[in-house]
């Protein structure tokens, strides 16, 4: 590359004189001249390059020129001579350009050197050749990709000083533009910095180009830095600059910042264009400041005389839908359409999605149909939204209809949508439809191995074992070989259905196909047999596993220990745990210890549970919430409340929070000790800890107050329970009715019994005994008779329990006519009696009432059924 040092160009002293006085030293010039008849008509097109400026009608050199060839001219005319001629034509840029084209090839000219920079300065001196200077700089940067901006700027400045040219901002700006045109944004940024250092005012369009490139490249900080430098030298930019800064803020997900930029520009009295208004609206929507967005839409119409674009209106509609304001979203859409702007698919999709979220599928469907009527074709997203919401609302006929419409217009559903459809069909008990959709998606290459696994898992989780089997066969027919994961899921489904023979046969089939069982395979089978109380078959699987030299891991041993505890072999489970720790050096998890502790608690052996807890701590295993909950429950059941409280203190010292089951056990324990004050204090702590009491907790408290005859407190709890949305169960009603009848409140007891029947809860033997023993007393009959007459006078229909009590009372006292009359009256009113209660009341066979403490112990379904 030609050096930029001028000392090597000149031949002092005579050539130095020539630069000072460009006249030749003789009447015959020694420099080559272009032909005088050369055309000087030069286009102003900025896209034209310097190469187009070579002589189109080049003739032989003039007679006064030396007889040398062009190649000789290129090789032997040195830069000093060319510069002398150029300086002589400095006031005629077109002539200077023609001379350079003739004497120096373009590729050599763009290598750099003083000739290039002198020509640039000459071209910049005339408005007619500005574009030529700009294009030359673009080519120069392209030919010198490694020349850093600092060197370029120094050459530009140095050449202007040495050859007496005025240095204008245009020269620097054209150099900046050259870097931009060559996509050298790193050098463009450096060049901009050098310009700012020299207090050169940049051309705003060029800076905008730099900002645009940086924003597109997500170099937001660099873009902001350039803008700040721009402002420091007094250049605020134009609307495009503002747009770029706002886009940068939106890319950073800082819409508030974009809004501030817009407001700052408006405060300076700027006149925003449509695009700037649109960006401001988008920023306001993302803030979201929808009041501002609507104000901007109105202001835009007022200042520009035209409504916003479809894209801008769509932004506002989408924002209102996100805020859940469907009414305003529809109003904006109607306004848009009223201005003759067609509804966009994006806006329509957003509105449809909003209607669906608000469970207004009818309106969503109407909008979808309206969109089609207006000639707007639904896209993949629109169809997917409709199908997804129909599936969520279990309207599978509509879902399938839209799914097929989607395919009919050749829009391929995504794998996610296929999965949603299959899941919906399975929930709707339509496994055949699910299989058909899968088969269709497979033919369309939408389904793949991973998706097959997910769909198969859906079948298994929902207990659709037959459909899962058909699916497995379908996969095999299509060449997809099921792996061990498929077989594990199939076995798990059979185990959950208690089909252990089928689970075992699947295991055998897997072995026949040469698939190796893994830890989950054995765990599933072993756990399944233990849960079905089939200890023998569980051990058969364990022995088969050991015989195959399979190395069991902690998962399997945890399963075995947990299973032994479930079948009442807790001591055996503990022995196995100790052997694993001692012989195999296994570090068993907290789960195994918890299973053993819970096993001992269930059989009432709290001492062994505590011993296991201590061993657990000695072996370096920290107890968790489950551990303490099991122990607290055991102590409460064995009426050792002091130890239960001690466990809670230890739990808190380890920074573990009591969970709802632990609180439930403590509350139940104190209720059974008739310590309702402590029980209710614990109950009051639950909301403060973010725990919602369940039906078991309420039942314990209601039972406790009933045992003490405090039915007012029990009624208050019942009302709170209902207000909190906790559904009462059979035990709740049994306890309440028992207490109310003993308290003589037959009216409320009757209402609760009717409520129980209305909810579809079937009374059991215990409730029947409570009713018979409570209603068969002489006092209750008289009270019920009086209540019946009062209700009739008030034209209020008595309930079945009240009728049954009065009829049975008359029957026992021999008033058969009155008994039959009331029976017929009851049937005429459409009241169907409870045969069991009625027969017991009439027969007079009254069982001994269960003790209150006995009834209160039946909180769990297991204990209730065993009574």
Curated annotation (Swiss-Prot):
Question: What is a single cellular component term in the Gene Ontology annotation?
Answer: mitochondrion
| Localization | Mitochondrion
Q: Where is this region: Disordered?
A: 27-74
> Could you tell me which residues form the transit peptide?
1-49
Comp. bias regions, Polar residues: 60-72
Keywords (alphabetical) are: Mitochondrion, Repeat, Transit peptide
Tissue specificity of this protein: Expressed in lateral organ junctions and shoot apical meristem (SAM).
Q: Give the protein name, as stated in the record.
A: Pentatricopeptide repeat-containing protein At2g39230, mitochondrial
Question: Which species is listed as the source?
Answer: Arabidopsis thaliana
């Amino acid at each position: 590359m030609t050096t930029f040092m001028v000392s090597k160009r000149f031949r002092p002293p005579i050539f130095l004189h020539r630069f000072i006085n460009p006249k030749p030293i003789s009447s015959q010039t020694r420099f080559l001249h272009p032909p005088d008849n050369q055309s000087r008509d030069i286009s102003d097109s900025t896209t034209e390059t310097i190469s187009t400026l070579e002589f189109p009608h080049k003739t032989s050199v003039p007679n006064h020129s030396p007889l040398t060839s062009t190649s000789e001219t290129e090789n032997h005319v040195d830069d000093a001579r060319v510069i002398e001629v150029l300086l002589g034509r400095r006031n005629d840029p077109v002539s200077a350009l023609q001379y350079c084209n003739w004497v120096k090839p373009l590729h050599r000219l763009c290598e750099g050197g003083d000739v290039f920079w002198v020509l640039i300065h000459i071209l910049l001196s005339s408005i007619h050749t500005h574009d030529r200077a700009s294009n030359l700089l673009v080519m120069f940067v392209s030919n010198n990709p490694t020349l850093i901006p600092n060197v370029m700027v120094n050459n530009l400045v140095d050449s202007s000083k040495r050859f007496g040219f005025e240095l204008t901002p245009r020269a620097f700006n054209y150099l900046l533009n050259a870097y931009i045109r060559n996509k050298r944004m790193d050098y463009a940024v450096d060049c901009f910095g050098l310009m700012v250092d020299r207090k050169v005012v940049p051309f705003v369009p060029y800076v905008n180009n730099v900002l645009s490139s940086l924003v597109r490249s997500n170099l937001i900080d660099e873009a902001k830095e350039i803008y700040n430098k721009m402002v420091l030298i007094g250049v605020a930019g134009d609307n495009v600059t503002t747009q770029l800064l706002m886009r940068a803020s939106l890319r950073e997900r800082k819409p508030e910042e974009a809004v501030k930029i817009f407001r700052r520009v408006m405060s300076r009295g700027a006149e925003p264009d449509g695009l700037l208004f649109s960006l401001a609206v988008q920023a306001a929507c993302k803030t979201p400041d929808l009041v501002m967005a609507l104000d901007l839409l109105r202001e835009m119409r007022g200042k520009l005389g035209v409504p916003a674009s479809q894209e801008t209106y769509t932004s506002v509609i989408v924002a209102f839908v996100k805020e859940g304001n469907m009414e305003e979203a529809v109003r904006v859409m109607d306004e848009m359409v009223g201005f003759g702007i067609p509804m966009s698919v994006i806006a329509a999709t957003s509105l449809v999605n909003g209607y669906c979220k608000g469970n207004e599928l009818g309106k969503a469907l109407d909008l979808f149909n309206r969109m089609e009527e207006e000639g707007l074709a639904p896209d993949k997203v629109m169809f997917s939204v409709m199908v997804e919401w129909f599936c969520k609302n279990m309207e599978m006929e509509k879902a399938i209809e839209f799914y097929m419409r989607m395919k009919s217009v050749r829009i391929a559903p995504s794998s996610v949508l296929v999965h949603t459809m299959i899941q919906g069909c399975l929930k709707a008990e339509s496994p055949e439809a699910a299989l058909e959709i899968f088969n269709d998606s497979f033919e369309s290459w939408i389904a793949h191995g991973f998706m097959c696994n997910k769909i198969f898992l859906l079948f298994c989780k929902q207990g659709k074992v037959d459909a899962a089997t058909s699916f497995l066969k379908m996969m095999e027919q299509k060449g997809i070989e099921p792996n061990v994961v498929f077989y594990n899921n199939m076995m798990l489904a059979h185990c959950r259905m208690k089909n252990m023979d089928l689970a075992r046969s699947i295991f055998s089939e897997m072995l026949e196909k040469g698939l190796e069982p893994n830890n989950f395979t054995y765990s599933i089978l072993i756990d399944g047999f233990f849960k079905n109380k089939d200890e023998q078959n569980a051990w058969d699987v364990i022995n088969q596993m050991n015989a195959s030299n399979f190395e069991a891991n902690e998962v399997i041993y945890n399963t075995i220990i947990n299973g032994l505890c479930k079948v009442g072999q807790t001591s055996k489970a503990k022995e196995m745990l100790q052997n694993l720790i001692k012989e195999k050096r296994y570090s068993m998890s907290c789960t195994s210890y918890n299973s053993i502790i819970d096993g001992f608690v269930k059989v009432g052996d709290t001492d062994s549970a505590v011993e296991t807890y201590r061993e657990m701590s000695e072996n370096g295993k920290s107890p968790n919430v489950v551990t303490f909950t099991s122990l607290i429950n055991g102590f409460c059941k064995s009426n050792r409340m002091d130890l239960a409280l001690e466990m809670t203190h230890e739990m808190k010292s380890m920074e573990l929070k009591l969970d709802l089951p632990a609180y439930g056990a403590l509350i139940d324990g104190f209720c059974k000790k008739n310590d309702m004050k402590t029980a209710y204090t614990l109950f009051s702590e639950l909301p403060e800890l973010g725990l919602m009491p369940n039906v078991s907790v309420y039942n314990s408290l209601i039972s406790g107050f009933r045992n003490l005859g405090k039915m007012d407190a029990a009624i208050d709890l019942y009302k709170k329970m209902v207000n909190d949305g906790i559904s009462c169960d059979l035990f709740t009603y049994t306890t309440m009715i028992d207490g109310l009848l003993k308290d003589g409140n037959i009216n409320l007891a009757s209402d609760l019994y009717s409520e129980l029947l209305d909810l579809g809860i079937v009374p059991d033997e215990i409730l029947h005994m409570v009713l018979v023993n409570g209603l068969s007393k002489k006092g209750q009959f008289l009270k019920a008779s009086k209540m019946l007459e009062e209700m009739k006078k008030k034209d209020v229909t008595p309930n079945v329990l009240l009728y049954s009590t009065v009829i049975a009372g008359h029957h026992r006292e021999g008033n058969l006519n009155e008994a039959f009359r009331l029976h017929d009256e009851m049937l005429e009113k459409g009241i169907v009696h409870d045969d069991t209660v009625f027969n017991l009341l009439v027969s007079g066979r009254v069982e001994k009432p269960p003790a209150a403490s006995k009834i209160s112990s039946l909180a769990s379904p297991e204990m209730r059924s065993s009574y």
